[in-house]
Amino acid sequence: MDANWRDDVTQGDPKIRLLSCTDALAYRDIRLDGLLRNPEAFASTFEDERDRPLDWFRERITQSQIFGAMLAQGLVGVVGLRAHADAKQRHKAMIWGMYVRREARQYGIGKRLIEAAVSHASGHVEQLQLAVVTENETARRLYAKAGFIEYGHQINALKHAGRYYDDILMVK
């Protein structure tokens, strides 16, 4: 992270806000960055999403609440929140798509994104769920510090490049 980014973070930034359709290009860029740099962490692939039209990303923004961490240099982190639509599951929501650009890590941006999603959901749902790949110890610690507890282990949840990845299921 260059000095300007570091200064932005230490001076109270980033600004955490819900993304809108006007953020579709920035969202596409950070999403593809995550899929390329950390393919084991996402169910989708870079190859699946790189050729999707911008309208696909706009629609994704409108179908969920996606929080973004904004610095002067642009969008450096995202996390999605999606409430269940089925009547018997409307008391629950799913945290998904968490990603912070490598150069913006270790500055508490992930913590701020999770706090924003949890705060937003608190008046609307009773339970938040998420899945995190077992190897991602940093994310698992972040979620545990935010009050999430492990309740399950999904074996072979994802398969990428011939390798299986297990997920830890967490709830708050």
Where are these regions (language model features)?
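Conserved N-terminal entry element of GNAT/NAT acetyltransferase domains
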Residues: M1-T22, D29, D33, I168
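Acetyl-CoA-dependent GNAT
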Residues: L18-D29, D33-E103, I114-A116, H120
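Short hydrophobic/aromatic beta-strand or adjacent loop that forms the aromatic wall/cage
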Residues: S64-I66, Y165-L169
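Glycine-rich acetyl-CoA-binding "A-motif" of GNAT/NAT acetyltransferases
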Residues: G74-G77, T138, Y164
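Conserved active-site alpha-helix within GNAT-family acetyltransferase domains
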Residues: Y107, K111, E135-H153
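Conserved GNAT acetyl-CoA-binding A-motif
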Residues: A121-A131
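Conserved catalytic-core motifs of GNAT/GCN5-like acyltransferases
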Residues: Q129-V133, I149-Y165
